[in-house]
């Protein structure tokens, strides 16, 4: 009997006992943060790029800001060996994945990798279908901490079954792995994936476009606003250990500074995984300031783990709230329009109870202090500088008037103060 057949028999035995029918607990108690190769580099990846990126993540303070996963997406694969075990592309990764994982770990980071539930990946490299337990064992030997698992070339597969099988394989291999389900929302994974993975994609792929998607002929990549519009009804499914994933960040990949700031802010309001996808070896100060904004990241990483809600939609202007720990709230006003918006907030107009969390804003009886989470803002956003000065830190006992530039946000953190007498 070949080694492959022995391994498959062992895997079937494990499954029949039900010993591995769970994901790893304790992971992703807040949304995962890291960097991924795909959005910027796609298949143009190699060992040198990964090591340089790891070095930059440490040097620039990106790891200290919370981005601990360095994830290699599609196109790392070689072929399967004679026993069916996956290998890396030795031309791209001459030292091997195990050595590369050790390098990433030496930087205080975690190592992520990619595969696909189908026979082939999206770029037509070997997928994991029929080799789930073998691949999981290889990943464990390489020291992998994160698996993004795609859904290309998956015709005739049952999504829940296919993802559950890889979940069980990862658990059987014995190394804790954050399992990122990339099924594009096609079979409503929010209804079944909380016991299978730690996050699940809710839509198709994102593009570096704020309000109009990018057409690639037989498919269209979605804009930031396209994806945002699909998230509000899904908030009840998210929470510690199981997150809605609106796809990786496009900050630094060609949108304006205002649009990058709005994109990052809204993903934080959604309690979304924050997975960077830009070139960290050639990053602007404006982009670095956005992705390392500790105050905004704290909104995303709040341990209460509640996804924000769109409270009011006035067309081009949206008002979002997110309950935070210790009675705090995050509030974001998003200007989707093409012109600056003169915004006046009369706080009592936003007195409501969030049914999901049971929390009430109580602006009629509770005074909050608030601070602008983007103060100071980049120097090229002249209108926003006035906003930052106006809303630096004050109380909700008086209205707030600010100017929000086109495709930009006002983001506030509200902290309760003494109750009115």
Tell what function each PLM region has.
Residues 261-311:
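Catalytic cores of secreted or luminal carbohydrate-active enzymes
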Residues 267-270, 275-277, 313-354, 407:
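Carbohydrate-binding surface patches
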Residues 27, 31-37, 66-72, 110-115, ...:
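Structural recognition of the beta-strand scaffold that forms the well-ordered cores
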Residues 131, 178-279:
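Glycan-recognition surfaces
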Residues 1-22:
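Bacterial Sec-dependent N-terminal signal peptides
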Residues 389-421:
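C-terminal beta-strand-rich structural cap/linker in extracellular carbohydrate-active enzymes
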Residues 53, 57-156:
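Aromatic-lined carbohydrate-binding/catalytic grooves of carbohydrate-active enzymes
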Residues 22-51, 56:
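N-terminal module-boundary/linker segments of secreted carbohydrate-active enzymes
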């Amino acid at each position: 009997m070949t080694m492959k057949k022995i391994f498959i028999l062992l895997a079937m035995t494990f499954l029949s006992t039900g010993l591995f029918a769970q994901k790893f607990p304790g992971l992703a108690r807040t949304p995962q943060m890291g960097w991924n190769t795909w959005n910027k580099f796609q298949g143009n990846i190699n060992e040198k790029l990964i090591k340089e990126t790891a070095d930059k993540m440490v040097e620039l303070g990106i790891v200290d800001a919370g981005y601990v996963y360095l994830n290699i997406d599609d196109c790392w694969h070689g072929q399967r060996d004679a026993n069916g075990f996956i290998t890396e592309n030795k031309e791209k990764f001459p030292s091997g994945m195990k050595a590369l994982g050790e390098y990433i770990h030496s930087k205080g980071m975690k190592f992520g990798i990619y595969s696909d539930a189908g026979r082939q990946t999206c770029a037509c490299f070997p997928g994991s279908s029929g080799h789930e337990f073998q691949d999981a064992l290889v990943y464990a030997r390489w020291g992998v901490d994160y698996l993004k698992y795609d859904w290309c070339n998956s015709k005739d597969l049952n999504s829940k079954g296919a993802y559950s099988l890889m979940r069980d394989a990862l658990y059987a291999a014995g190394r804790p792995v954050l399992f990122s389900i990339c099924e594009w929302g096609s079979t409503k994974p929010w209804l079944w994936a909380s016991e299978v993975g730690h996050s699940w994609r809710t839509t198709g792929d994102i593009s570096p476009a704020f309000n109009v998607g990018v057409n690639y002929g037989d498919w269209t990549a979605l804009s930031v606003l396209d994806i945002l519009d699909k998230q509000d009804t899904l908030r009840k499914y998210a929470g510690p250990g199981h997150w809605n994933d609106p796809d990786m960040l496009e900050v630094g990949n060609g949108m304006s500074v205002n649009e990058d700031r709005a994109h990052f802010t809204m993903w934080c309001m959604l309690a979304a995984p924050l997975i960077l996808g830009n070139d960290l070896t050639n990053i602007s100060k404006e982009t670095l300031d956005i992705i390392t904004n500790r105050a905004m990241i704290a909104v995303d990483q709040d341990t209460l783990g509640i996804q924000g809600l769109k409270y009011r939609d006035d067309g081009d202007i949206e008002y979002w709230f997110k309950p935070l720990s210790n009675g705090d709230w995050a509030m974001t006003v998003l200007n989707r329009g093409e012109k600056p918006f003169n915004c006046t907030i009369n706080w009592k107009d936003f007195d409501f109870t969030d049914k999901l969390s049971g929390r009430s804003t109580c602006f009629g009886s509770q005074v909050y202090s608030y601070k602008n989470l983007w103060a100071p803002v980049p120097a090229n956003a002249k209108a926003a500088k006035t906003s930052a000065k106006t809303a630096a830190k004050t109380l909700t006992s008086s209205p707030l008037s600010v100017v929000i530039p086109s495709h930009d946000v006002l983001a506030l953190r509200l902290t309760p103060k003494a109750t009115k007498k």
